[in-house]
């Protein structure tokens, strides 16, 4: 919210229907919606899901085959896009953190002559890419589409907060959180290595009251997670990374 303070101050004066802002190099986009007497800030995951669903709707209205589309996100982003992919029928791919990996997926589609299959890519850290003109986050295009999407829902009598709530009611409510832990210096690196080693050797049986039903260790070049869609290409392996994913019951992770 702090990053939007100047915009929110101006919004109090001009009373807009939507506040959109980018960072100085215009690769990340944040938004705020006036609702219930205050401004509601959408998370990066929520905006990614909203754009993904809206783009699928636009593709359908334009007579495109939505099931042929490919969307890309990261292994640390919300699991909610998987539910959208299953419902719409498009393919959802998960890559390591970093937009270069999303760009790699675009290159693969381009090399196969199938650029038009790319629906969008996003990270939970407010980075979005719609179109194949770039291989990095593009807040300029994302801002234009966000405004167009807001207009689309306004014609239906909804703001973006209400549109997101409608998706939650349809697909289920997803809560995403990040905890940052610092391990400075050589001793910190050793401690972190010990924690990761312990998790690999003795994985927890439950986390937060949810049973652990699966574990993926990305240090071993794990297979790229894919959901739904055509899945025309052979399975891909992700580059090795010191990341462990625990899958919990009820589609939590």
Predicted ranges, named:
Residues 3, 43-56:
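Catalytic or ion-translocation cores adjacent to nucleophile or general acid/base/metal-coordination motifs
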Residues 1-31:
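N-terminal small/polar loop signature for handling phosphorylated ligands or for N-terminal nucleophile
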């Amino acid at each position: 919210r702090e990053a939007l303070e100047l915009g929110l101050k101006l919004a109090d004066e001009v009373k807009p229907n939507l506040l959109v802002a980018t960072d100085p190099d215009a690769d990340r986009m944040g938004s705020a919606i006036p609702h219930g007497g205050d401004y509601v800030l959408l998370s990066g995951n929520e905006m990614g899901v909203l754009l993904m669903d809206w783009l699928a709707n636009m593709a359908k209205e334009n007579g495109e085959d939505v099931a042929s589309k490919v969307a890309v996100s990261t292994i640390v982003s919300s699991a909610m896009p998987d539910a959208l992919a299953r419902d719409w029928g498009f393919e959802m791919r998960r890559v390591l953190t970093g937009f270069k990996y999303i760009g790699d997926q675009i290159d693969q589609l381009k090399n196969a002559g199938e650029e038009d299959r790319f629906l969008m890519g996003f990270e939970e850290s407010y980075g979005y890419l719609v179109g194949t003109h770039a291989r990095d986050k593009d807040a300029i295009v994302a801002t234009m589409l966000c405004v167009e999407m807001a207009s689309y829902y306004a014609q239906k009598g909804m703001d973006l907060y209400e549109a997101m709530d409608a998706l939650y009611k349809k697909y289920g409510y997803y809560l995403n959180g990040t905890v940052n832990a610092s391990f400075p210096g050589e001793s910190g690196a050793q401690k972190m290595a010990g924690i990761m080693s312990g998790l690999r050797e003795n994985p927890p049986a439950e986390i937060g009251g949810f049973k652990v039903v699966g574990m993926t260790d990305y240090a071993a070049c794990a297979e790229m997670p894919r959901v739904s869609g055509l899945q025309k290409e052979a399975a891909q392996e992700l580059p090795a990374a010191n990341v462990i994913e625990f899958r919990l019951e009820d589609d939590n992770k």
